[in-house]
Amino acid sequence: MKIKSLFVCVFLLCFNHVFSQIKEHLVHEDYERLWLTYLPKHYSENKSYPLVIALHGGGGTAKQLMNNTRKRFNKLADKEGFIVVYPQGIKKSWNDNNTRDTNGFARKENIDDVGFIKKMINQLTSKYAINTDAIFACGVSNGGLMSQTLAMELPNKIKVIGMVASNFGLDEINKIKEVSPFSILFIHGDADPIFPYNKGEIRVFKKTRGPVLGIEKSIAYMCRLNGNSGEPTINAIKNSSIKDNCTSEHLVYPNLKNPSLKVELIKVKNGGHTWPGAKEQRLIKKLVGKTTQDFSACDKLWAFFKSTMN
């Protein structure tokens, strides 16, 4: 009898684990669009949950982002009580509506990724108990640019984003009159060999992928948009991992008129084109640079998102 009870318990634990991570899909413009949904432990229809949309980089997948970040968002979802989804780009790319180049399949074919994400959000909010005032987007590289595009083109749905190893394309300079304010956290390594920290060209395998503003001008754009002014407060992040040869600091740009509109930067000194706290990809380290282990970008992103809910 004890063995039978133990079997039932193990089965239920496995079932709950499978249920918490769900493969979902919809059809948009004749493409089947896919994503992974992770529901927190003890999910209840009687509660209301924030939604975090996590977007992989160019050449990546939804599953890779989840696994390479050590499933940290999932663990935070269990602890903090939010839903996280990992959408999949067509042929591993996102159409971030930036004219810098047409090398990515999604940009080349003008895939309607904004329409897909909008439809995905609508499907999720009709299916799960989601707080529609707390929908956040974040991503790395091409996924970071896609997050920016979502904030600019879906202002009624997404008002807070995070960009990892990415900053604004040169096009954005001319968009400021068309864009509604939104809060943003940049996380960027100043030794990123692919997506330049300073103004320059994105380069992949020595081929240019178009110009970007760089962090300084991207922040200036956001401060102008949101009304942030003055010198930032700067706090060092504990250097808990000496071996990574990186240090980091957190810059917060003040907004006295509207503190709810936030502009922040975590600068990773000597950091590369990587997601802080992620598994280090040794085979491509020379291509992407160093990965700091002093903190998890997932933790910092969620803390930032959560701060905008207060």
Tell what function each PLM region has:
Residues 186-188:
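Short beta-strand/loop motif that positions the catalytic acidic residue
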Residues 18-51, 64, 69, 76-80, ...:
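A domain-start/cap signature at the N-terminus of enzymes
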Residues 54-57, 86, 267:
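Structural cue for short, hydrophobic secondary-structure segments
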Residues 106-128, 149:
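Alpha/beta-hydrolase active-site loop
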Residues 208-249:
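Acidic, glycine-rich loop-and-strand cores that form catalytic or ligand-binding grooves
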Residues 49, 57-61, 271-272:
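Active-site glycine-rich loops that stabilize anionic/oxyanionic intermediates
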Residues 80-92:
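Conserved alpha/beta-hydrolase
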Residues 4-14:
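Sec-dependent N-terminal signal peptides
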